C-alpha cells in the first residue's frame, strides 16, 4: 500500500498534499480553518445537489418548492437548514482564515493570497445568488437592491443592470440565471481552491513565528490530520446545534413571505455575513461613491502585501500591531451590527465613523505602527 501511495499517479498527488507533506511543527489551531473550509465546501455541494433535485427555478413555484422540500421530502428540512446554516459556518471559517492570514503575514505569499481574494469574491457572489433562490420577500428585494447598484457605473450602468436582470426588473429570467450560476460556481470554487493549495505547497506554509521552518518539519499525517478531525467535530457540533435547535436564528423572517414586487419590506438587508460591506455602502450618501467603497472594502485585501512595512512577518512579537488588529476586528463587528440597523440617527453617524476608521486602520495606522515598531527594535 505504501508503494502504491508513492507511485500511483493519482495517489501520489494525494500523498504529497495530505499525507507526506512536510509541515511546520508549531501550527496553532488558527491553521485548522483551511481544512474546515474544504469540508464546508463539500458539505455545501452535497446538500445543494439534493436541494436542486427538488427545487424549481421559476417565480411561480420557487417559494412553494422550498416549502415542499421542508414539508414533504424525507429529511428535506434538515438538508435545507444544513445548506443555509452551512453557508454561515463557511463564512465564519472564511473570515477567521483571512484574519489569520492578516495577523501572521501570510499575505506575503502573493500567488496564494491573490487566489484567496478571488475565492472570497466568488464565494460572496455564490452566497448572494443562493439567497435569491427561495424567492421570499428579502430574496427578491435583496436581489433588486444589490443588482441595482451596478446602475451607478457611468454610461453603461443601466444597460448592464437590465442585461443581468434579463428584462426591466428582477423576474423569472433573473431567477433562472441565478440558479444556473449558483449551481456551477461551487465547482469553480473547488477548482480555485485546488490552485490555492497548489501555490501554497509550492513554497510551504507560513507558521506562527513567521520565520523559516525548513529545519523543523513533521509529516502532515498523522499529526495534523488528527488535529483537523478535532476541528471538524467541533464545527459539526456547532452546525448541528444551529440546525436542530435554532435553524432560523441567522435568517430573516421576511423570507417566509413570498416575494411581492408591490410591497417593499421596511428594512432591506442581506445575510449577516455581508452586513459589514453593506454598512460601508450605506455610510456614503453618493450612490457611485458607496459602490466604490463597497468594492474597496474587499479589494483592499489585494493591497496588503504592498503595505507591509514591518521587518517582521507576523504580529506575534509586535504588541502595538496586535492591539490595532483587534481594534480592526471590533470595528468590523460594529459595522456588522450597523448594517442590520435602520438608516436613522445615531446609526448613520456610527456607520460613517466605523467605515472611515476601517479604511484608516488598514491604509494608514497599521503601516505607520509597523514603522514605529521597527524604530523601537532599532531596525
UniProtKB/Swiss-Prot annotation:
The protein's required cofactors:
heme b
Report residues binding a ubiquinone: 201
Residues that coordinate or bind heme b b562? 83, 182
Q: Which residues cross the membrane?
A: 33-53, 77-98, 113-133, 178-198, 226-246, 288-308, 320-340, 347-367
What keywords is this UniProt entry annotated with? Electron transport, Heme, Iron, Membrane, Metal-binding, Mitochondrion, Mitochondrion inner membrane, Respiratory chain, Transmembrane, Transmembrane helix, Transport, Ubiquinone
Q: Quote the record's cofactor note.
A: Binds 2 heme b groups non-covalently.
Query: Which positions does UniProt annotate for heme b b566 binding?
Result: 97, 196
Q: Name one GO molecular function term.
A: ubiquinol-cytochrome-c reductase activity
One of the record's GO cellular component terms: respiratory chain complex III
Pfam families referenced in this protein's UniProt entry, alphabetically: Cytochrom_B_C, Cytochrome_B
Q: How does it sit in the membrane?
A: Multi-pass membrane protein
Q: Where in the cell is it found?
A: Mitochondrion inner membrane
Concerning its family, UniProt says: Belongs to the cytochrome b family.
Record's subunit section: The cytochrome bc1 complex contains 11 subunits: 3 respiratory subunits (MT-CYB, CYC1 and UQCRFS1), 2 core proteins (UQCRC1 and UQCRC2) and 6 low-molecular weight proteins (UQCRH/QCR6, UQCRB/QCR7, UQCRQ/QCR8, UQCR10/QCR9, UQCR11/QCR10 and a cleavage product of UQCRFS1). This cytochrome bc1 complex then forms a dimer.
Miscellaneous? Heme 1 (or BL or b562) is low-potential and absorbs at about 562 nm, and heme 2 (or BH or b566) is high-potential and absorbs at about 566 nm.
The protein's job, in short, is: Component of the ubiquinol-cytochrome c reductase complex (complex III or cytochrome b-c1 complex) that is part of the mitochondrial respiratory chain. The b-c1 complex mediates electron transfer from ubiquinol to cytochrome c. Contributes to the generation of a proton gradient across the mitochondrial membrane that is then used for ATP synthesis.
Its recorded name reads Cytochrome b
Species of origin: Massoutiera mzabi (Mzab gundi)
What is the phylogenetic placement of the source species in the record? Eukaryota, Metazoa, Chordata, Craniata, Vertebrata
